[in-house]
C-alpha cells in the first residue's frame, strides 16, 4: 500500500462501529520468528471488557494473510469469518463484564504502510522489526487497531538464541529452550496497538541512566548492530540533557518504571516513536549527531503521542505538531529564543493541502508536522507564555495514559486562558487551509506633535477568507526602536500610528510569531 492511500477514508473502512462495544484491557502476544522462511507463528490472548452486552459480533482487525488455526472464546472453540482486514466472531449474549479471546495462527506477514513487518538482513545476519503506524499492527497480530483503545501488554518473542529480541516496556525474563531463546517484555502503562513493536537482531547494548528532578531514575538503553554500535552510542549520549529539558517543560518522563531506548532498524524514512523503544534508521546513525532534531522529536513523542495519545487519526497533529514544536522548545531552552526562531524558520511552507485537523491527503505530510508546530507557536503568542507553559503541563497531566481529541485540547486551552478560542481553532485547525498571505504599504507624514504612519494591509490568501490575528509592528528610529501590537480583523486593514520620532524602517511581525508572508508594495 502506498503512503498516499493511508487516509481517513481507508481507516474508516478498516474499523467498524461495533468495536466500540468492547474495550481491550490486555494483550498477551507470543510470536515465534522463523526468519529463514520469513514467517511467524503467533499465540495471542486478548482480555476485553464488554461495554455493550447486546453486541453479537466481536470484530478484530487481522489481515487474511495469516492462517488462523484456532479461536477460543472463554476457552471454548468458536467459529469465525474473515474479510481482507478483519476477523469476526459471532457470540451469544454474554452476561459478564469481560471475555477472553485466544488465537493461534501462522503465516507470512504483509508489508503495508511504512513496512509493518520486515524480515531484513544486515552484515550477513537477519534483522527483524515492525512498524505499525497507523493501522498495520494487524498484519502480524490480531487486535482492535484504533489509537484510543489502549491496553496493557505482555510481548514474548522467540528466535534463534544468537539474537537479541526487544520490545516495549520492561524486560521480565529470558528463557532458553534448545537452540531457541524467548524474551518476555511487559508494559506497566497502557499502550496503543500501533506503538507495540518487536525488534530481533545481532544487537549490542549500551546502558546509562537518567536521574530525574525528583531523584528517580530512568533506565536508558541503546541497541545497535556491531558495525554501528559506537556511532549509535555517541548519538545517544545527550539523552540525559533532552530528558531534563522536557521534564522541566512538560512533567516527569511518562514511562519512568520501564525504560527509554533506541533500537537500530533498517527503515529509510528516519525514526519511529514506539513506546519506550524508538526505532532509528541505520542511515540516520552517524556518530556525529547530524540528526539531533529527529532524536529530540522522537523522545518528545513519549509525552505527545504515546502518553497522551490521539483520540482518532483525525487528531494526528496532536502527536506530530507537538513533537515538532518540542524540537524548537528544546533549542529555545538551551540556546535562547533566536534558536527557536531558526528551528521554526526551517519548517515553513504554504501548507495548502488541507486542514490541520483530519488532513485529507496524507496523515504524515509537512502540514501535520510543521504547520502543527507553527499553530502551537501562534497559540503561545495568543495566550501568553506563562499560560501556554502551564497549559502544556496540565494537558499532559490530565490526559497522560489516555487519549485526547483536538476538541479536548481546545477545551483545556480555553479553560486555562479564560478566552474563547473558537476563532483561533477554526482558522488554524478545523477550517483554514494554507497560511496568511498579505501585501502592504505605508506612508509616514509629519504632524505638529511628531509623525503619523498609515499602514495598509491586504490579505490575499485563498485557503481562508479573513484571518484575525495579533500583529506586532516594529519601528526603528534614529536612536531607538519600539514594538506595538495591533489586532488585524479585516481583509483590508488600515493601521494608523502616531510616533514622536520619524520611523526609519518598519517591520511587520519582527519576532516571527505568525505563519504569514508580508510583501511590501511601496515604502518611503
Q: What does each model-identified segment do?
A:
Residues 237, 279-339, 392:
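Zinc-dependent metallopeptidase catalytic helix centered on the HExxH motif
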Residues 58, 63-122, 178-182, 492-502, ...:
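A surface-exposed beta-strand-loop module
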Residues 42, 133-135, 143-296, 325:
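Hydrophobic helix-coil surface modules that form long, contiguous segments used
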Residues 365-455:
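Amphipathic alpha-helical substructures
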Residues 314-378, 382, 399:
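Acidic/His/Gly-enriched intrinsically disordered linker/tail segments
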Residues 67-73, 421-422, 435-438, 443-509:
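Beta-strand-rich binding/interaction modules
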Residues 12-19, 95, 104-154, 201-209, ...:
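Glycine/proline-rich low-complexity spacer/linker segments in large multi-domain proteins
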